[in-house]
């Protein structure tokens, strides 16, 4: 048994992920990993596109200093439910706006329904540099059919600017696809 600091990751589910990684490395016995190595590594873990809080970078210039930008490549219903649990832990006085881009072969309606009573609005985008994405207009209609206010936007930059103009204190959550998360991170 080892007492560890919390991982440098957002979301309670990450504790389970880290525990699994540690247990796996111990069971493989190929690596001579010491407890102090694990303790040090846990505080330095970075998981790009998984509940990533964007604190610096080019995208920050499109929002107010009070807006929080989160990115997660969640693309299925199970991941959506895990992310919703994390969003439930955030400041309930801040409205959450979702920027959403998804691939065509996903369960769009079920994914979106997970966030029905959590997000204020969904802004849909096409996923750049991908062929098999669901068109933003169709995705927006699905969100509206789930009872969530939704509109389309032409770019992540405009989506961020418009959300920040509407609510300079909002949490902006970008999700729906690992490809989408990657494109957003590339812009940053």
Question: What are the functions of these language-model segments?
Answer:
Residues 1-121:
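Nucleotide phosphate-binding/pyrophosphate-handling subdomain across enzymes
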Residues 65-71, 77, 112-171:
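C-terminal helical cap/extension that packs against the catalytic core
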Residues 137, 185-188:
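ER/Golgi luminal nucleotide-sugar-dependent glycosyltransferases, focusing on the catalytic module
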Residues 177:
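Active-site-proximal loop/hinge segments that shape catalytic or ion-binding/gating pockets
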Residues 180-182:
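Short, active-site-adjacent cap segments at secondary-structure transitions
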């Amino acid at each position: 048994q080892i007492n560890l600091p919390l991982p440098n990751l957002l979301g309670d589910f990450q504790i389970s992920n880290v525990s699994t990684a540690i247990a796996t490395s111990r069971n493989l016995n190929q690596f001579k990993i010491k407890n102090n190595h694990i303790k040090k590594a846990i505080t330095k873990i970075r998981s790009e596109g998984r509940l990533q809080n964007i604190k610096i970078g080019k995208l920050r210039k499109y929002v107010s200093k009070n807006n929080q930008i989160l990115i997660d490549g969640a693309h299925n219903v199970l991941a959506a439910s895990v992310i919703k649990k994390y969003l439930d832990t955030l400041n309930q006085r801040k409205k959450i706006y979702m920027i959403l881009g998804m691939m065509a072969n996903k369960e769009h309606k079920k994914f979106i329904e997970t966030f029905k009573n959590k997000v204020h609005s969904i802004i849909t985008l096409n996923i750049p540099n991908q062929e098999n994405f669901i068109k933003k207009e169709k995705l927006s209609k699905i969100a509206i059919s789930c009872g969530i206010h939704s509109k389309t936007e032409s770019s992540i930059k405009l989506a961020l600017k418009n959300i920040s103009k509407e609510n300079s204190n909002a949490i902006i959550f970008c999700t729906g696809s690992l490809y989408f998360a990657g494109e957003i991170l590339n812009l940053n």
